[in-house]
Regions:
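Glycine-rich, low-complexity intrinsically disordered segments
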Residues: 1-383
Length: 383
């Protein structure tokens, strides 16, 4: 009498005890050949991804005192209160002010080593308007029997101008509205000739109010970058300013929850690994010590001044810097241990690990291993 098979796990049940076949190998089997009657969505797992992150690169405006004194609308930026919203807007949009003692802009509201604008990433609600890639084609005119032929006639890359609508959570005191007003007002003042960019931007004929928007789509564990997209350059072109002046007697107290800013973008980059490299280069340009450690291969080592924060400890640290591992596509978050807040958290976690109460992270995120990614950044299919 044949003995009933004993299955050790659920995967063996699907593989040997079910006509649907293996769930783990369903992708490779769908690629390899036809499975009549048993293939399709029943065994193939859906593509699960997280929304990920939206990063906005800081522009390089010239908001020095000399420029601000040229126009009365910028007078409000020249406050002696370092930790105020006007100083935050001024230093965020002009990183050079932070290291200029005479400008009195060493505010604790920003991390000047961060190339991105954290408040926009943290408060981003939605981004819409990215164009699709298309293949241009040309079709001949019809012949006597209405026959025609068609060929590819163009490039697939998108270098066109398009608009992105980005919605942000509108918090108390409206720092985002003030930030974009300063940004857009400065751009128009440069056009009028009332404000002047920094001399190096004039010498190299560069535009200083441009930014770049990065979209990072993450895997279901929020560990690896599944897709990356970015525009060539972008700059804001709208500011919802008329709505706050409207009036209705039946709504004396109304919450302005979201604010939508339109960006004019030039070019869209998809499925191009150069976006990964440019993302990292942006981070390195704003942080000389990080750039040095990457060049010398020290980043992530024991002698590094940057600590790679694991997933379960990210909320314990401040001023984290994102950096993409080109080989594995892992989005790593580094804490600068030269900052007192991060050093305190780092020392506390080390003491916690030595105690008997410390338990390593368990669950789905603990099972994520870099070995599933090869050196080209492509996920290996289980066969």
């Amino acid at each position: 009498m044949a003995q009933d098979p004993i299955f050790q796990n659920l995967e063996q049940v699907h593989t040997y005890g079910s006509p649907l076949g293996s769930r783990a190998k369903s992708l490779s089997e769908a690629m390899k050949g036809f499975r009549l009657g048993t293939s399709g969505p029943k065994t193939l797992q859906p593509n699960l991804e997280r929304n990920g992150y939206t990063f906005f690169v800081r522009p390089q405006l010239n908001l020095s005192a000399k420029n601000c004194l040229r126009v009365r609308q910028l007078f409000r930026l020249l406050t002696d209160k370092v930790n105020s919203i006007p100083t935050f807007c001024r230093t965020t949009l002009d990183p050079r002010l932070y290291i200029t003692p005479s400008e009195n802009c060493r505010t604790s509201l920003i991390d000047n080593d961060n190339p991105f604008i954290p408040i926009l990433t943290n408060c981003c609600v939605s981004v819409s308007g990215w164009p699709d890639l298309t293949t241009p084609s040309w079709t001949s005119s019809e012949g006597m029997r209405r026959e025609a032929y068609s060929i590819v006639d163009g490039v697939m890359e998108n270098y066109e101008a398009f608009d992105l609508d980005v919605s942000f959570f509108n918090m108390q005191d409206e720092p985002i509205s003030q930030l974009f007003y300063t940004w857009e007002k400065y751009a128009t003042l440069v056009f009028e000739g009332k404000c002047h960019p920094y001399p190096d931007f004039i010498a190299f004929n560069e535009i200083d109010y441009n930014t770049r928007i990065y979209r990072l789509v993450m895997d279901k564990t929020d560990t690896y970058v599944s897709k990356i997209a970015c525009c060539g350059i972008a700059y804001p072109i709208s500011l919802p300013s008329g709505d706050y002046a409207n009036f209705r007697q039946d709504t004396p107290l109304e919450a302005k929850k979201d604010i939508t800013i339109r960006f004019r973008c030039l070019g869209a980059v998809y499925y191009d690994d150069i976006a990964l490299q440019e993302f990292n280069e942006t981070v390195r340009q704003f942080n000389e010590r990080l750039d040095t450690e990457v060049s010398e291969g020290m980043l992530g080592s024991k002698s590094s001044s940057f600590y790679q924060v694991p997933v379960e400890h990210r909320q314990a640290f401040s001023f984290l810097l994102p950096y993409i591992d080109i080989n594995t596509l892992e989005l790593k978050w580094y804490a600068d241990l030269s900052k007192p807040e991060n050093k305190v958290a780092y020392d506390y976690l080390n003491k916690l690990k030595e105690s008997e109460y410390y338990k390593p992270m368990q669950g789905v995120l603990a099972d994520v291993q870099p070995k599933i990614i090869n050196q080209t950044g492509a996920r290996e299919v289980l066969v």
